[in-house]
């Protein structure tokens, strides 16, 4: 699939990010707070998707929903990113095809009528175009008024019980694969500092506008990129479990995935692929986003997949051949059978992890 930043014949009528304080998946309720809210409800945070039995034998409905506030100013790309983000939960189950999508949209009451019409129409177009790219369709949804713009949706697949990968079967000896670099939320925040002189002055000695625009364009394309190829290759290479990395960061989502496993295991993350320049900016400001701690939010991030090392190496090779974007082996699945207590399943980032600075490659 080809993705490109749209050529603009005219300036943006407004900046979407001027109408919200929280941005992208950074709007999620913190993981610890969410766990307390869900106490006594179902299985807590649980899986990325709901699994519902239908009235037909061996047929299930897999469903997910997600929405957020704008994190880029271009409404068309905001729609594409939102759609890709919704679909990623299905893709983390190894489900390549989404049967139906609904769109959730809030039009900003803080905008002028012209700005609201312009931005809402382009967000809808971007979301719908991305759904079509994914081989799906938008059949309905809900549109409301709200001070902050919102875009997201619902994704549904109907399939047989043996046609998806339940995220519970990681085994000791597996490795962890990540299909997109970290640092999207950090990159978006730094890019917005370009228009805020008092903040830009804090980092203009170690970066420049050209560098900032380059990595921001890369982050935008990365967030808009579908994880669909990864989902297909998960099946081909016998993945045992997966999640997508979004608002809880790499550590939060890997911990949740570890806690869903049937065996007593621990995930150890030894490598962090990070969009180039994000580490130096984090270091310069004394780590305000906690990117190296693994708790920085990501928006429409990559798949984190547990599979055998041999299959992981083949997976990384093939996904690069298809998409011209790298994937990385970033961790190991460690046996914790001596504990005999699955409730202690967890994920950690090892001390002084290897940092891979990922070059901005916009060849999507």
From Swiss-Prot:
Catalytic activity: hydrogenselenide + ATP + H2O = selenophosphate + AMP + phosphate + 2 H(+)
EC number: 2.7.9.3
GO biological process terms on file: selenocysteine biosynthetic process; selenocysteine metabolic process
Entry-linked Pfam families: AIRS (PF00586), AIRS_C (PF02769)
Spans through the membrane: none
Annotated site, Important for catalytic activity, chain positions: 28
Binding site for Mg(2+): 48, 89, 244
Keyword match Transport: no
Main enzyme class: transferase
Record-linked InterPro entries: PurM-like_C_dom, PurM-like_C_sf, PurM-like_N, PurM-like_N_sf, SPS/SelD
Subunit field text: Homodimer.
Superkingdom assignment: Eukaryota
Keywords, comma-separated and alphabetical: ATP-binding, Kinase, Magnesium, Metal-binding, Nucleotide-binding, Selenium, Selenocysteine, Transferase
Residues given in the record as ATP binding sites: 28, 46-48, 66, 89, 141-143
Gene Ontology CC entries for this record: cytoplasm
UniProt record similarity statement: Belongs to the selenophosphate synthase 1 family. Class II subfamily.
Lineage: Eukaryota, Amoebozoa, Evosea, Eumycetozoa, Dictyostelia
Residues spanning the signal sequence: none
Co-factor remark: Binds 1 Mg(2+) ion per monomer.
GO terms of molecular function: ATP binding; metal ion binding; selenide, water dikinase activity
Annotated protein name in UniProt: Selenide, water dikinase
Active site (catalytic residues): 25
Cofactor(s) the record lists: Mg(2+)
Function: Synthesizes selenophosphate from selenide and ATP.
């Amino acid at each position: 699939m080809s993705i490109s930043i749209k050529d603009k014949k005219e300036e943006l009528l407004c900046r979407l990010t001027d109408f919200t304080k929280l941005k992208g998946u950074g709007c999620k309720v913190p993981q610890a707070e969410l766990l307390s809210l869900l106490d006594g409800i179902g299985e807590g945070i649980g899986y990325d998707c709901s699994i519902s039995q239908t009235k037909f034998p061996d047929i299930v409905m897999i469903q997910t929903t997600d929405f957020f506030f704008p994190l880029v100013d271009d409404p068309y790309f905001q729609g594409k990113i939102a759609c890709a983000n919704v679909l990623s939960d299905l893709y983390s189950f190894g489900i390549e095809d989404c049967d139906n999508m609904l769109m959730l949209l809030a039009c900003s009451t803080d905008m002028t009528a012209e700005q609201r019409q312009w931005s809402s129409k382009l967000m809808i177009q971007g979301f719908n175009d991305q759904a079509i790219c994914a081989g799906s369709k938008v059949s309905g949804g809900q549109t409301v008024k709200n001070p902050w713009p919102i875009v997201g949706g619902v994704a549904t697949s109907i399939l047989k019980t043996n046609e998806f990968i339940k995220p519970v079967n990681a085994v000791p000896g597996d490795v962890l694969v990540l299909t997109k670099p970290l640092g999207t939320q950090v990159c978006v925040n730094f890019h917005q500092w370009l228009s805020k002189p008092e903040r830009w002055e804090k980092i203009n000695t170690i970066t420049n506008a050209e560098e900032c625009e380059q990595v921001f364009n890369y982050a935008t394309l990365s967030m808009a990129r579908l994880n669909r190829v990864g989902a297909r290759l998960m099946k081909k290479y016998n993945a045992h479990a997966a999640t997508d990395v979004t608002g809880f960061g790499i550590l939060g989502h890997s911990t949740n995935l570890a806690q869903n496993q049937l065996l007593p295991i621990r995930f150890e993350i030894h490598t962090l692929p990070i969009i180039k320049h994000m580490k130096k900016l984090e270091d310069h400001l004394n780590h305000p986003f906690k990117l190296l701690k693994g708790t920085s939010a990501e928006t429409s991030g990559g798949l984190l997949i547990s599979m055998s090392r041999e299959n992981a190496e083949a997976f990384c090779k093939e996904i690069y051949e298809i998409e011209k974007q790298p994937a990385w082996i970033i961790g190991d699945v460690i046996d914790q059978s001596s504990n005999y207590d699955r409730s202690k399943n967890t994920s950690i980032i090892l001390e002084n992890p290897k940092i891979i600075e990922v070059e901005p490659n916009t060849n999507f």
